[in-house]
Each structure stands twice: as structure tokens, then as C-alpha cells.
Amino acid sequence: YVVWDHQQDSRPIYIADIKTAADESRYNVTQSTLDRYLDIARTKYGVSNDPQFGEFGKKKQTNAVFARIDWQLNATNLLTIRNNFINEDNKQSESDNSSINLYEVWIDRKSHNNSLLATLRSVLSPKLTNELKLQHFLVYEATTPNKQLPSSNIPRAIVENVESISGDKSMYTSIQLGGQRYAPEHFKDNVLQLVDNMYYNTDRINYTFGADFMYTNMKSLYGSEMNGRFYFTGLDNFENMTPYRYAREIALVDDPTVKMNTLNSAI
């Protein structure tokens, strides 16, 4: 039989969506401050003319397909094949760790995994049964920058102590543009596992004898904080392009991709 499951999430995301005074208090920023920030970001830092604050549509969908077939080869041998595939496409999956992050900061995340399992169950005698299993498992996940940014990502610019005045009250927040700190990164794992168990049942004791062999191939690119970040204090320094600090993690090799092969066994 075959089963398909589909899930879809279209709840919007809100980025400093200022409509009332209560919104200003919640975000610690006024619309006039956002307007000034965005004008600087566009004229001096190349931010897109597309909207960066407000309400945005968000799409996340997951599809899962499961299939199974049982094949009675003969009176004593049953072959079962199962396959489970899951695919997820999550647009604007997450932003960053500043209080307010522009829309361009939000990353996309895609992933899929597939598990294929074949089981041969053989009844050798009334007291003896053998079960042989072979499984391949694939996992892949990729995180990519927002479509408004290059695929290789760009540095972040974090403006701290952004002041807004509402009535007689001063409010402060931090606003960020540029690339999210994780992207781009990807993880791909292949696992091949062979298990053979023999079950011997007596009137008083049930015995299990088995062997398990598992081979894993991993290929990963971890990109956390490797795009770099500039720190500014206040909008005046942001406008004058005078950061007080720059930080970046760098790879010590030309290709930072991590490749690993492991073999595990048990009896």
C-alpha cells in the first residue's frame, strides 16, 4: 500500500509591524526611526527597495510518502520492503538574534530524507527463525540566504542602541541587515545498515543471536558566523559607516567541508 501526507503552513511573519502606539512599545521603535534606518540601509548599504518591515506571507510545506509491499516468496520466506520519504520546503524559516531583523535576513531551509528497508523473514524450523534486514537511510538539509542576497551570503550589519522617542519616553533596540549567521550550510548523511538476527525458542528460554553492521558517510558544511558582522552604535554611526567592531570566524583550510566515514559493528 501507499500513503501520502501533506502539511502546509501559511501563517505570516511580522517584522517590526508598527500600526499603533502599543506596537511601538512592543518593538521599542517608532515608524519614523524605521524609515530613517531603511533610508540609510538603501542608500549606503545596498538594501533592496522591496519591503523590509511589516507583514509578510510565509510558506512551509511538508510532503511524506510511505509505501510497503509484502511478498510471500514461499511457505517459509516472507520479504517485506518499506520506503518512507519526507520532503520539507520552509521559506523564511528563521531570522537572526538581533531584536529586529530585516526581511532580507530571513533564510530558507530545505530538507529531505529517505529510508528504504528490506526484511527477509525465514522460518527454518518450528523453533528457529531468521530475520535479515538491509536498510539505506539518506538525510539532506540545506540552508540558503534570502533570495534578495547572493547565494554565498554577505556580512551582517548590527546597529545597537537605536534610539526612538515616543512622547516623553526614550526606547532602544537593535536592528540588523545582511546575511543570517548560519547560511549557507548543508548536511548530507548516507547510512547503510545490515542486521541479521536468529531467534531460537524453547519451552523455557528464548534465545536471540545476531550481528549488526552499519556504515555511515557524512558530508557537512557548517557556516555559522563565517559571513562576518559589523557592529554600530546608533543611527549616526550607521549613517557615517563607522562601525566600532568587526568579527568573523574563518576556516583554516581552503575547503571547510567536513567529510567523515564510520563503520560500527556489534554481535
Regions found by a protein language model. Name each.
Residues Y14-S48:
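A subset of solvent-exposed loop/turn segments in beta-rich extracellular surface proteins, enriched
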Residues Y1-D9, Y14-E24, F66-D70, R82:
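Predominantly transmembrane beta-strands of Gram-negative outer membrane beta-barrel pores used
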Residues W4-H6, L34-I40, F85-N87:
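Glycine-rich, acidic and aromatic/proline-enriched surface loops and short helix-turn segments
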Residues P51-E55:
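Surface-exposed cleft-lining segments at the edges of enzyme active sites
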